[in-house]
Amino acid sequence: MSSAPKQTIAPHGGTLINQVATAEQRQKYQDGAGGFKRVRIDDRAVSDLELIAIGGFSPLTGFMGSEDYHSVVEKMRLTSGVVWSIPITLPVSAEVAETLEIGESLGLEDSTGTLVGILDLAEKYTYDKLREAEMVYRTTDEKHPGVKVVYGQGDVYLAGPIMLLERRPHPLFASRQLDPADSRQAFIDKGWRSVVGFQTRNPIHRAHEYIQKCALEIVDGLFLHPLVGATKSDDIPADVRMHCYEVLIEKYYPLDRVILAINPAAMRYAGPREAIFHALVRKNYGCTHFIVGRDHAGVGDYYGTYDAQYIFYEFEPQDLGITPLMFEHAFYCKRIAGMATTKTSPSGPEDRIHLSGTKVRAMLREGLEPPPEFTRPEVARILIEAIQKQGQ
């Protein structure tokens, strides 16, 4: 490899945002905490606050005002013209909003009552929940988990710049916690000029492993960035998934070409729009490429199998600034005795080993390992143990 790079890809919008309080600022705000009105925010808002502050959501410096919100919902762009596909907002009830005055600083507290951030209130506005659901999630069905959140949240959005008072270690995965500035430096230290990001909220099976390794053939490094924020109640817990990832990497991946780090974001399940969002966030972490597979960030049957890939063609490459690597569904092909997709397999469905998620979960509950062509035995054993513990 040629001489090590001195910098990574530019962050989205050109500047990596840092809204984390210095020790001096933190002391100032904590000393004056008694004078702040305080607003309790949910876990998703806490993770959004954190990601804004550390630059994961660059160029955002706070929760969106009404003009940016409407522009994102309708056009997938900020009013500046920068591509942004998911509204990042702070909902409160109308009753709470009435007690707040534009221009004041608000203390943001988490579910335990701990003061985690400051919002300089620039605006408060109402919004159309049905329109947000229709445009962002492509459905108004309240059974959709993302739509359910929108319908159930407060009727007023608060907007303004934020400050995160303290960057706290993750209670479970502190050793895997890399902020965008950290991951960018890690890529430079490794001499990686090109890095592919992979988003996941599920255990990695052979199909995922295959497309990651296909991507590794054309880039310098893999940034495995599993989501550990809020997900659906029936998703595999984050600690179990992380154990699967660590075991898999240790045994089956080139250790010098993979970095595993947590993504503190919450899932929206917004399918195509969230695929764009996930790519832009990984760009902020320093990735030059991003893997988009089948039904990325989807749920149920709300989106077409490859809608999350097609949406990338709605934007000019320079407006995204990160290259999507699009893969079809992978499977084990018995005829060639290896992993393939319909692009590379000469066989029909009869020679493909493919198991539905429902079938796999049923096997794991019964203590049965799926075939090694579908998942690595080490991963299967971790999942069996976890599922059986849940059932006790």
From Swiss-Prot:
Pfam families: ATP-sulfurylase, PUA_2. It comes from the Bacteria. GO terms for molecular function: ATP binding; sulfate adenylyltransferase (ATP) activity. Its EC number is 2.7.7.4. The keyword Metal-binding does not apply. Pathway: Sulfur metabolism; hydrogen sulfide biosynthesis; sulfite from sulfate: step 1/3. Keywords: ATP-binding, Nucleotide-binding, Nucleotidyltransferase, Transferase. One of its GO terms (biological process) is hydrogen sulfide biosynthetic process. InterPro entries: ATP-Sase_PUA-like_dom, PUA-like_sf, Rossmann-like_a/b/a_fold, SO4_adenylyltransferase_pro, Sulfurylase_cat_dom, Sulphate_adenylyltransferase. Transmembrane segments: none annotated. Signal peptide: none annotated. CDD domains: ATPS. The keyword Transferase applies. It catalyses: sulfate + ATP + H(+) = adenosine 5'-phosphosulfate + diphosphate. HAMAP family: Sulf_adenylyltr. NCBIfam families: PRK04149.1, sopT. Belongs to the sulfate adenylyltransferase family. This is Sulfate adenylyltransferase. It comes from Gloeobacter violaceus (strain ATCC 29082 / PCC 7421).
